């Protein structure tokens, strides 16, 4: 195994621990310089979970605490000369999930207590907003420096109940009450930084704080969290080479695979490509390219959102929306798109400046396969989808160019779930095929679109390419004819591989595949 060059901070989100432990730190302090030069005072940042928000918040805390020694060699070291020590109040709300009103009030109490021990508690300060107000004022009076307030994951207490009006309202009132002093505390505040997954106006809990700079979709801040291609290919290049050596890949091949799995996030109109930092760090540390981010937990609010809007798995990607669609309250939402985007399951792939519309797609292979696996049981159960079942068997037979055996396996599978699929529409069968072929993409390259036409599925193997066309109550011969007439094979002639055309017909009365036709060019 090739020697790893950097120490990666897996699971570490505290800036001081990373710097003192000599872990790799991707320098983001130039963004703090930008805040200070522009005299920004109230900043809001929305990013998906596990995307580096907490680390950036911790970096800000260390900076405003004047911990100069931690920033040696970083961009801000050349900018900052004074290193003033400000009182910093850092509230982490990520632990306030699945709470009722009493539990949330208790959690806020625990967040406030350490600062009351430092700066005292005034008589008559009982409610969280009164206590926050008093802490900030006393911190300023006792230190002579304005306070800094950092609120990390501000929306965590609300996301799981975002579609439950009776539960959302009391929790939202508590959080509105907690944040309410911030505007009138302006004379005592040096800087305020708030992070979350949703945009603040969506949960309408900052109604009084109308001077927030929402930088979430600004081009210049697109890589404030996450890892850019430049950062990856400079600071992490030696470990990409080492990973490639372990996986019998060249540097270029390894970089391409990392890109396919973890890149592709765009947070603005002209955003540079951004890699998921959680998955990238896990992959380089574990020396294996695998799905990590989706496996770290699918939020319950996402599943509830998909269920509420009856989202079909085929309808998730390549959606077009207005910029205003990202900025609606939960009560007014008409689709799952805003939460899918802000949660990191979809990202911006195109922007039409004439129409001011965005096209959203899955950012990368990791997210797409993870999402499909999560939703597959709704369509494909009771058969499990692992290497030993349908997808694995199907791929093994295609790998051996045993197309006949692969089709026999697929027919048997569809027959096994025929009762589940009885009286369903053509679209339901298309969904089943869509899931099966896209789940193959977890192991092999699967393509749907070409410049010439759109085959139902194209599966690449080391020595062969398989082009599938599916018909519903038609004929396999008709499917083969469409492959020929539309020229679906043309893009693959130059590959020098064996080329197979497979026409498949599904019979709605039999509720399984009735016939198929295989032709090799």
Show where each model-derived region lies.
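Domain-level recognition of nuclease-like catalytic cores that cleave nucleotide substrates
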Residues: 491, 497-521
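Active-site metal-binding core of divalent-cation-utilizing nuclease and nuclease-like domains
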Residues: 138-143, 436-462
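Metal-dependent nuclease catalytic cores in nucleic-acid-processing enzymes
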Residues: 178-185, 338-346, 434-439, 483-502
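Conserved catalytic cores of phosphodiester-cleaving nucleases, focusing on short active-site segments
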Residues: 433, 455-472, 486
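Structural motif
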Residues: 148, 464-466, 500
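Mg2+/Mn2+-dependent nuclease catalytic core
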Residues: 169-173, 472-489
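Phosphate-binding site recognition
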Residues: 1-425, 440
């Amino acid at each position: 195994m090739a020697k790893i060059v950097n120490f990666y901070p897996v699971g570490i989100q505290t800036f001081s621990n990373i710097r003192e432990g000599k872990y790799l730190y991707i320098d983001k302090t130039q963004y703090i310089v930008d805040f200070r030069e522009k005299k920004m005072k109230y900043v809001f940042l929305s990013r998906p979970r596990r995307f580096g928000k907490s680390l950036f918040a911790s970096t800000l805390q260390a900076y405003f605490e004047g911990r100069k020694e931690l920033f040696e060699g970083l961009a801000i070291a050349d900018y900052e000369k004074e290193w003033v020590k400000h009182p910093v109040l850092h509230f982490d709300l990520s632990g306030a999930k699945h709470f009722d009103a009493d539990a949330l009030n208790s959690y806020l109490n625990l967040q406030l207590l350490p600062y009351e021990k430092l700066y005292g508690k005034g008589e008559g300060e009982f409610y969280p907003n009164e206590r926050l107000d008093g802490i900030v004022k006393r911190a300023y009076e006792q230190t002579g420096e304005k306070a800094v307030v950092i609120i990390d994951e501000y929306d965590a207490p609300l996301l799981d109940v975002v579609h439950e009006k009776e539960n959302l309202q009391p929790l939202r009132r508590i959080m509105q009450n907690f944040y309410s002093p911030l505007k009138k505390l302006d004379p005592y505040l040096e800087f305020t930084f708030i992070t979350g997954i949703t945009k603040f106006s969506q949960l309408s809990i900052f109604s009084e704080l109308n001077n927030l700079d929402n930088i979430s979709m600004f081009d210049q801040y697109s890589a404030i969290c996450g890892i850019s291609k430049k950062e990856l290919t400079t600071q992490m290049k030696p470990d990409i080479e080492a990973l490639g050596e372990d996986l019998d890949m060249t540097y270029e091949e390894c970089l391409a695979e990392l890109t396919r799995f973890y890149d592709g996030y765009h947070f603005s109109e002209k955003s540079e490509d951004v890699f998921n930092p959680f998955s990238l760090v896990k992959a380089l540390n574990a020396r294996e390219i695998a799905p990590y981010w989706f496996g770290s937990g699918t939020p319950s609010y996402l599943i509830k959102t998909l269920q509420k809007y009856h989202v079909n798995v085929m309808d998730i990607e390549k959606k077009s929306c207005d910029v205003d669609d990202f900025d609606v309250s939960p009560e007014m939402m008409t689709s799952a798109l805003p939460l899918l985007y802000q949660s990191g399951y979809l990202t911006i792939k195109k922007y039409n400046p004439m129409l001011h519309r965005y096209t959203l797609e899955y950012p990368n292979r990791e997210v797409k396969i993870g999402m499909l696996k999560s939703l597959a049981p709704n369509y494909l159960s009771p058969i499990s989808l692992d290497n030993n079942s349908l997808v694995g068997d199907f791929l093994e037979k295609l790998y051996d160019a045993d197309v006949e055996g692969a089709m026999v396996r697929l027919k048997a599978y569809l027959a096994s779930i025929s009762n589940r699929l009885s009286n369903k529409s053509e679209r339901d069968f298309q969904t089943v095929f869509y899931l099966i072929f896209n789940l193959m993409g977890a192991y092999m390259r699967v393509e749907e679109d070409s410049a010439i036409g759109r085959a139902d599925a194209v599966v690449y193997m080391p020595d062969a390419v398989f082009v599938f066309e599916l018909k519903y109550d038609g004929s396999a011969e008709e499917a083969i004819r469409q492959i020929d007439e539309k020229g679906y094979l043309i893009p693959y002639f130059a590959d020098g591989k064996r080329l197979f055309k497979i026409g498949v017909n599904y019979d709605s009365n039999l509720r399984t595949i009735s016939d198929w036709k295989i032709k090799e060019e």
